[in-house]
Amino acid sequence: MTDTQNKNYIIALDQGTTSSRAIIFDRDANVVSTAQSEFVQHYPQAGWVEHDPMEIFATQTACMTKALAQADLHHNQIAAIGITNQRETTVIWERDTGRPIYNAIVWQCRRSTEICQQLKRDGLEEYIKDTTGLVIDPYFSGSKVKWILDNVEGSRERARKGELMFGTIDTWLIWKFTGGKVHVTDYTNASRTMLFNIHTLEWDQRMLDVLDIPREMLPEVKASSEVYGHSKSGIPIAGIAGDQQAALFGQMCVEPGQAKNTYGTGCFLLMNTGKKAVKSAHGMLTTIGCGPRGEVAYALEGAVFNGGSTVQWLRDELKLINDALDTEYFAGKVKDSNGVYLVPAFTGLGAPYWDPYARGALFGLTRGVKVDHIIRAALESIAYQTRDVLDAMQQDSGERLKSLRVDGGAVANNFLMQFQADILGTHVERPQMRETTALGAAFLAGLAIGFWSSLDELRNKAVIERVFEPSCEEAHREKLYAGWQKAVARTRDWEPHENEE
């Protein structure tokens, strides 16, 4: 432990979908410097999305060098590296050369849809849900691995001989940073592959057989907070978590019933369920997060399709606002939405409805409705959808929501945060540090090497900037929410199904 006493910094590598970032934290968890580098998105066909793994590694290395230079630090002052990454994105490379045999297939890519349809036809939905906690979807890594092995000649045979390696982005980066010495992933990333038994915490042989994926190519799976190996310059790599789970840990949601919402284009909600892997009756995913010391804790995950994108629609298509920041001002000009509800089912409805045939609608229009009411209804829709998901999570888990921690771009909107607290009837806690994903990776790495000694010490670092307390009567809250549920019901099943056209 003494070695870390002279090393006062931790570097978090945040490898995202559109850019690589490096953030250096000091012992008080303050950001000392950050560097960011975007990379190319490849769209070879409609619905296909790829990245160049070598470019990801190059941008991530460059960011690390740049962040160190900006802070005037040398690598021997860094106590550890923590890694957080875009989840599910799949890389296969040669063990001997470290060269990928194909581009990385990104989580958004839909090319393996037919493979997933076949899994459904084979009656595997219940088995996959029970074993991996996931639904059958091209989103997850398993079908992407099969697609590469099916389409790159000779690759399956080479994988059987141990010549090829599979990894999600964390695994790929660690392999490169350690000079090909360490082939490892953590439980949070493994839980997103559709190949991992989340109960036994082992790769699932039946899923490997079904998808014809040789076990020889899979990484070892370890806890999210331990020393996995060292970079070529000798820095311990000591923390790994997928981006949403890293944010959950960075928000210190380590006890059952603690939840966070990341408000982005859509919303990502995760609720810690502790030692209990809860099977959802509402289409939530059962996934692995981190407990107080980075050990396995289970979580429920739900996604809202249209959050910030609803505000973008007001700005870009309807031209009602010039800037997303203006919504707070306009929403505050009226005392309520005047009975207006906007259901932003532009691409159908996500959790807990899962209705691809729903379409967006505005309800409750009268001659007295102004632009301000519509803008307010758009913001309120984000809070209502968040409640939809959190209510379902509470029903599934039997855990009462203790409070909601929030991060992402929209948390700067005080109107939205206050309305969120009102409609949930619970505290909404906004952290001072907005870099919660990177902070989670730094916390996990720091705990592993004794840079930070305890959870209490971390809690003191994860400072809450503002708490929004519910200010509305329960009867009024439930009346508003009943109106939302009525509006949602009327958007359902709008689009004709294929066989009806």
UniProtKB/Swiss-Prot annotation:
Q: Where does ADP bind?
A: 17, 21, 265, 308, 409, 413
> What GO terms fall under cellular component here?
cytosol
Q: What is its EC number?
A: 2.7.1.30
Q: In which pathway does it act?
A: Polyol metabolism; glycerol degradation via glycerol kinase pathway; sn-glycerol 3-phosphate from glycerol: step 1/1
Q: What influences the activity of this protein, per its activity regulation comment?
A: Inhibited by fructose 1,6-bisphosphate (FBP).
Please give the biological process terms from Gene Ontology that the record holds.
glycerol catabolic process; glycerol metabolic process; glycerol-3-phosphate metabolic process
What keywords is this UniProt entry annotated with? ATP-binding, Glycerol metabolism, Kinase, Nucleotide-binding, Transferase
Query: Which residues are listed for glycerol binding in this entry?
Result: 87-88, 139, 243-244
Question: Which residues are ATP-binding?
Answer: 17-19, 265, 308, 312, 409
Entry-linked Pfam families? FGGY_C (PF02782), FGGY_N (PF00370)
Instruction: Provide the catalytic activity annotation.
Output: glycerol + ATP = sn-glycerol 3-phosphate + ADP + H(+)
HAMAP family annotated for this entry? Glycerol_kin
What the protein does comes down to: Key enzyme in the regulation of glycerol uptake and metabolism. Catalyzes the phosphorylation of glycerol to yield sn-glycerol 3-phosphate.
What the record says about family reads:
Belongs to the FGGY kinase family.
Q: What is the designated name of this protein?
A: Glycerol kinase
Q: List the lineage, top down.
A: Bacteria, Pseudomonadati, Pseudomonadota, Gammaproteobacteria, Pseudomonadales
